[in-house]
Every structure is written in structure tokens, then in C-alpha cells.
């Protein structure tokens, strides 16, 4: 596998990626894309392929240089640069022992509190330590602005509207509050929406940020998390506003949203104005079926099912990737990747096989 990836290199081309996302041209090769790679995966790749060997470990910029080097080696045109860290909002979290075997184990894995978040009352809302854009540490983004190669781009995730409302209230509490205290829910949507609008504007002020990527899980296997009416009235208008900011600043608006979103897909495409949809699961809607339904209206990203990658051997993975590409590369608007993220529980070899088969496709 090491030999194949090294002998079949691909070079980033962010301009072609942008044309793919806008469905302006049929790609000349397969472009990989991911919401993000877990830290453990990136570290494993860097050690396996000797990407750290000539770096100065005492250099404070080592981590940023490695972000570029790892993603460039893997063939990505854009990659996530986390600016808003997971602890920027004060949330109730449930750490549990990570069950990943071997060197990719991270010790603990944090799960969202489903029942009661830090905000339950108007008093909690008033006393909550609301973060501001002014409090962000932008040094990593400023460094990328000066040092990121011109054929690459970066992004951070934005527009976690429903997700953050859910985290702050707790999903169970949200379901009650929609009926018992809608004004509190609306106040949360307003506060969170304004924060992410400001953050989207900030991201657009950096030339190195090539795309605006909203990330907001809105569904589960059989339905949306809350009613489509609630989503249309309280959540999607904020995504529309973020998409408008992105488009006004010459960026495509991508959305990562897990779950069965069939009831709001037309809204996402026609009213929000998304350029690309990410996150697909075989048990909900395989990406090949999604491509047949939606590819004339929106670009589709990823879709190699994470559960499948975790459980399958090389021949099956190669076959699945090739079958997916035969459908999704027939026209415009597709990039190869996992159905969700490159999580640390995906076997590294399986992930690399997926990438390698993508490199082989047009050869």
C-alpha cells in the first residue's frame, strides 16, 4: 500500500475542486474530500509514510506544517483547520472509555448529554458565558493565510445551529421546550445563529479559506430530529443566511448533515442554496442513489459508508469504491470520501485502500 500511494501521487488543485463543487465541469480525476480526519489517523499517516522525519520538533509551527503535509500527501485540495475548539462553548459532556483497539485509541470519547444541557431556564440563558467572535484565537488561520500553498485551501466548520441548540438544552429538553417554551428555543436559535453568521463573515475575510462548510446534524436513520416545519422556520433560515454570505464572497456553501433529510432536501437545495451535500449512510440513502436523485441540482460528497469501511476487506472496499465512482463520476459534481469522517475506529488500511482505488480510477 505504501508503494502504491507513493507511486501514484496526485497534486492538489483547489480551483478544479471549486469547479466540481459548483458543477461547472466534469473532473479530470477523482478528487478526495472529507469533513475532517481524526487526529489519530493523521498521526498514523505521518508516521507510516515518514512525513515528520525532516521537521524540527521544536518548531512551534510544526503542527501547522504537518496539517499541510499530511493532507497534501493524501491528495486533498482543502482541509479543516479547527479554530473554534470543542470547549469554546461550555457544554455538559459524557466522557466514556474509547473502545478502539491499538495505537489509535484516544483514551476517552466524549458523547453529548441527551437529557439536560447547561440551559434549562431563562435564568440559565441570561447567566450563560456566551462566547464571542472577538475571543477567538486566529493565529493558526493567520499563519495559513501567509503559508498555505496556492493550490490548496482550508476551512473551519460553521453553522452548528440545531446542534448547538440541542447541546445547550439537551435533546430531550429541546423536544419539550418546543411545546412548553418556544420563546426560549427561539432566543437560543437567535443567539447561536448570530454567532455563526459573524463567524462565517470572519472566515470569508481570509483568502486561504476556500469553502464555507456548514455542519449541522438534523436527522437520524428514519426521520429528522425535530419536525421539518421547525427546521424550515427556525434553523434553515440561518443556513440560508450563511450560504448568502459565502456566495457574496465567492465561496461555495457545503453542508454536512447526518440523518434522513428527505423531507427537507428540496429546502436545502432550493431555499438555502447549498452547493454540495455531505454525509451519507447506506442504511438511509446510499450515495449512488442520492446521486441519481439530486446530482442535476447539487454536488454530492463522500458516501463510502463508514460501517462498511470498518467491517470490510480490501477486495470489497475496492469494488465498492469503483462501483460508486462508475455512477458518480459519470457526470459533474462528485468527490470521493467516507460517508461521515475518517474516524479513528476506521482501520487505517481500509481508509488508504479507498484513496488508492480513487487514484486508480481514471488510470
Where are the regions that the model predicts?
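Active-site loop segments of alpha/beta catalytic cores
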Residues: 1-42, 46-55, 101-112, 116-363
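Active-site-flanking structural segment that lines cofactor/substrate pockets
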Residues: 44-73
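N-terminal substrate-binding region of glycoside hydrolase catalytic domains
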Residues: 57-58, 75-80, 120
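Catalytic domains of carbohydrate-active enzymes, especially glycoside hydrolases
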Residues: 63-83, 202-207
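Short, charge-rich binding segments
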Residues: 69-74, 91, 143-147
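Short, glycine/charge-rich beta-strand/loop segments that flank catalytic centers
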Residues: 81-93, 160-162
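Active-site diphosphate/adenylate-binding microenvironment
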Residues: 97
Amino acid at each position: 500500500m505504501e508503494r502504491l500511494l507513493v507511486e501514484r501521487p496526485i497534486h492538489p488543485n483547489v480551483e478544479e475542486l471549486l469547479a466540481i463543487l459548483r458543477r461547472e465541469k466534469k473532473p479530470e480525476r477523482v478528487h478526495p474530500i472529507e469533513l475532517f480526519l481524526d487526529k489519530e489517523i493523521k498521526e498514523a499517516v505521518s508516521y507510516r509514510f515518514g512525513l515528520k522525519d525532516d521537521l524540527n520538533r521544536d518548531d512551534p509551527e510544526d503542527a501547522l506544517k504537518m496539517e499541510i503535509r499530511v493532507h497534501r500527501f493524501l491528495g486533498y485540495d482543502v482541509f479543516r483547520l479547527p479554530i473554534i475548539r470543542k470547549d469554546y462553548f461550555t457544554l455538559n459532556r459524557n466522557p466514556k472509555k474509547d473502545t478502539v483497539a491499538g495505537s489509535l485509541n484516544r483514551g476517552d470519547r466524549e458523547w453529548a448529554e441527551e437529557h439536560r444541557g447547561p440551559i434549562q431556564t431563562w435564568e440559565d440563558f441570561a447567566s450563560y458565558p456566551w462566547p464571542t467572535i472577538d475571543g477567538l484565537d486566529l493565529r493558526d488561520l493567520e499563519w495559513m493565510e501567509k503559508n498555505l500553498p496556492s493550490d490548496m485551501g482550508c476551512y473551519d466548520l460553521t453553522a452548528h445551529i440545531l446542534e448547538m441548540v440541542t447541546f445547550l438544552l439537551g435533546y430531550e429538553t429541546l423536544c419539550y421546550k418546543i411545546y412548553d417554551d418556544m420563546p426560549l428555543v427561539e432566543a437560543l436559535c437567535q443567539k447561536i445563529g448570530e454567532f455563526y453568521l459573524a463567524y462565517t463573515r470572519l472566515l470569508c475575510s481570509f483568502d486561504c479559506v476556500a469553502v464555507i462548510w456548514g455542519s449541522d446534524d438534523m436527522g437520524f436513520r428514519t426521520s429528522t430530529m425535530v419536525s421539518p416545519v421547525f427546521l424550515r422556520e427556525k434553523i434553515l433560515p440561518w443556513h440560508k443566511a450563511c450560504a448568502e454570505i459565502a456566495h457574496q464572497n465567492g465561496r461555495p456553501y457545503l453542508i454536512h448533515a447526518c440523518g434522513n433529510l428527505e423531507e427537507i432536501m428540496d429546502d436545502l437545495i432550493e431555499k438555502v442554496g447549498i452547493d454540495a451535500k455531505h454525509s451519507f449512510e447506506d442504511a438511509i440513502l446510499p450515495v449512488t442513489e442520492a446521486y441519481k436523485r439530486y446530482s442535476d441540482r447539487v454536488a454530492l460528497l463522500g458516501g463510502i459508508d463508514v460501517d462498511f469501511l470498518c467491517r470490510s476487506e480490501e477486495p470489497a472496499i475496492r469494488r465498492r469504491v469503483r462501483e460508486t465512482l462508475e455512477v458518480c463520476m459519470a457526470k459533474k459534481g462528485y468527490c470521493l470520501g467516507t460517508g461521515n469522517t475518517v474516524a479513528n475506529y476506521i482501520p487505517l488500511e481500509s481508509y488508504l485502500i479507498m484513496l488508492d482505488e480513487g487514484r486508480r480510477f481514471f488510470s
